[in-house]
Amino acid sequence: MHIKTLTVSQLNRYVKNTLDADFILNNASVKGEISNLKIHSSGHIYFSLKDGGSKINCVMFKSYAYNLKFAPENGMDVVALGNVSVYEKEGSYQLYVKDMKREGIGDLYVAFEKLKEKLKEEGLFDDVHKKEIPKFSKKVGVITSPTGAALKDIINVTKRRNKGIELLIYPALVQGTDASRTLIEGIKILNKVEDVDIIILARGGGSIEELWAFNNEELAYAVYNSKKPIITGVGHETDFTIVDFVSDRRAPTPSAAAEIAVFDREVLINEILNYKYNIKNYMENIIKEKRNYLNLYKQKIEANSPTNIIVNEYKNIDNLKELLNMKIEGKLNKEKNNLSRLSSLLEAHNPLNVLKKGYTLIEDEGNNLITEKEALKELNKINIIFKDGRAKLSIEYIEEF
């Protein structure tokens, strides 16, 4: 019989092909305990599954790990679904996990979803039933474990935000078979305390089994029927319980629940001071505006008063009088200038001025001016006019040139 010699790579490839062709190994469902867990920065998860007798290496790639409903931890019992194949480089086989569920949790998830759907159909989750969260609570009821971290967180937040707020704490179990009963009792008792303004139902984080008391149907009805508003702060931000859907406000953590229930005193003081400042400015602006209107109306009244009208008329008369005087003075000056001009013109044409140069004027006895010698032929006597007098002369002869 001839035996074919294979290289290591050929052998690993052959084993891989053989495993990949196996129907059972391609659809394997393996139950075991997680160990050697490593969550890589790439998002891939590497771990081993073990039981009392052996273990198998496993890998869950990022695309599948993204859809996990829980955070895997060492020591956790799970059921992994995937295919068995060979990692050729190392010559080792491992389970390539595509999905993973916590062992024994499946029934709890089914019960959770069933109750959630039932209460939703009954309208317990409807916003119309949500009670208003008071903005300024004076006393806050807290239902939680007296020894848990949740209570410490709530107390710390309350002291930081408002030391004047009173916390009324009802010590309750927050996990175990009797937890739901004590939580319901706490709601009933705090509803009877008249000055409790709001109730916080809280506990710290935990597994689904540890939080299961908050998925109780009777507790859900107790929260729904509470006369006082209830804020739930159960687990961490990713944890959701039935009471979170029923409550009037769901907070991601107990600390966040306290932030909602307890108003910040410093913030309130600052808001009041800000309102005071705004009101002061508003009133000052109104007063300023009204004062301006008052001054305007005052000016109008003063302007239209009889005294001011008379004073203004006197001013108008004085102005008209001054204007009239200016007009008259201007007219007189103009006439004086015209008179002076005409006087100068008349003076320039005064015949007596010619006489001052040694000339004389000749008139007949009727004082008619004689300008030609022919007129003398009919006259015996003439008047001679000098610059400073006149003389009467007789004509002896007339000589022609």
Curated annotation (Swiss-Prot):
Keywords assigned: Cytoplasm, Exonuclease, Hydrolase, Nuclease
EC number in record: 3.1.11.6
Organism, scientific name: Clostridium botulinum (strain Hall / ATCC 3502 / NCTC 13319 / Type A)
Lineage: Bacteria, Bacillati, Bacillota, Clostridia, Eubacteriales
GO biological process assignments: DNA catabolic process
GO MF annotation list: exodeoxyribonuclease VII activity; nucleic acid binding
Enzyme class: hydrolase
InterPro entries registered for this protein in UniProt: Exonuc_VII_L, Exonuc_VII_lsu_C, OB-fold_nuc-bd_dom
Function: Bidirectionally degrades single-stranded DNA into large acid-insoluble oligonucleotides, which are then degraded further into small acid-soluble oligonucleotides.
Catalysed reaction equations from the record: Exonucleolytic cleavage in either 5'- to 3'- or 3'- to 5'-direction to yield nucleoside 5'-phosphates
GO CC aspect terms: cytoplasm; exodeoxyribonuclease VII complex
Cellular location(s): Cytoplasm
Subunit structure, interactors included: Heterooligomer composed of large and small subunits.
Matches recorded under HAMAP family: Exonuc_7_L
Pfam families in the cross-refs: Exonuc_VII_L (PF02601), tRNA_anti_2 (PF13742)
Protein name: Exodeoxyribonuclease 7 large subunit
Entry similarity comment: Belongs to the XseA family.
